[in-house]
Design a protein with these regions (language model features):
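Intein/HINT protein-splicing elements and their conserved insertion hotspots or analogous self-processing inserts
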Residues: 101-128
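His/Asp/Glu-enriched, well-ordered alpha-helical/loop segment
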Residues: 1-65, 79-83
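Glycine-rich loops and low-complexity Gly/Arg-rich segments
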Residues: 12-17, 83-87, 114-117, 122-124
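Alpha-helical structural signal
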Residues: 32-35, 88, 108
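C-terminal cap of metal-dependent C-N hydrolases
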Residues: 55-105, 112
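Residues within well-formed alpha-helices
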Residues: 8, 34, 93, 114-118
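Secondary-structure transition/capping residues
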Residues: 17-20, 38, 46, 89, ...
């Protein structure tokens, strides 16, 4: 969950440096620019940008802010107002994987049932 990672990184830097202003701009830069630079070293399609020929990885978040949101406070809204459970739609490499919180590319119920069965078997193996 990228948003939770952002929150943790934000708190860790402030705590470590005893500075409430620390890492305010660095964390989103690491997440949105740094991650793309690293990934672009290893993948052939451009990542971290919306343009023709790029991977087209996008999420749509259901977020209705209580206060005005603009370019000057967007990071604050993302950091304090958004979490991963608000993701409604996910597009990866141009393919819609989840729309309106419904997975389109796999059988979620079967996967969950298989996981529950495997977890039960593991618990039985561990606990006897």
């Amino acid at each position: 969950d990228m948003m939770e990672s952002w929150k943790v990184a934000n708190i860790l830097h402030k705590h470590h440096l005893c500075d409430p202003t620390a890492a305010w701009s660095e964390i989103p830069q690491m997440l949105f620019e740094g991650n793309a630079k690293i990934a672009n070293r290893y993948f052939k399609k451009p990542l971290g940008i919306l343009k023709v020929g790029a991977a087209a990885d996008v999420i749509v978040i259901d977020y209705d802010p209580l206060t005005p949101m603009d370019a000057s406070n967007c990071n604050s809204h993302l950091l304090f107002g958004v979490n991963g459970s608000m993701v409604q739609t996910t597009v990866c490499n141009g393919e819609i994987l989840m729309k309106d919180r419904e997975l389109l590319v796999c059988d979620e119920k079967k996967i969950m049932a298989d996981c529950r069965q495997a977890a039960g078997e593991l618990s039985e193996d561990i606990n006897g």
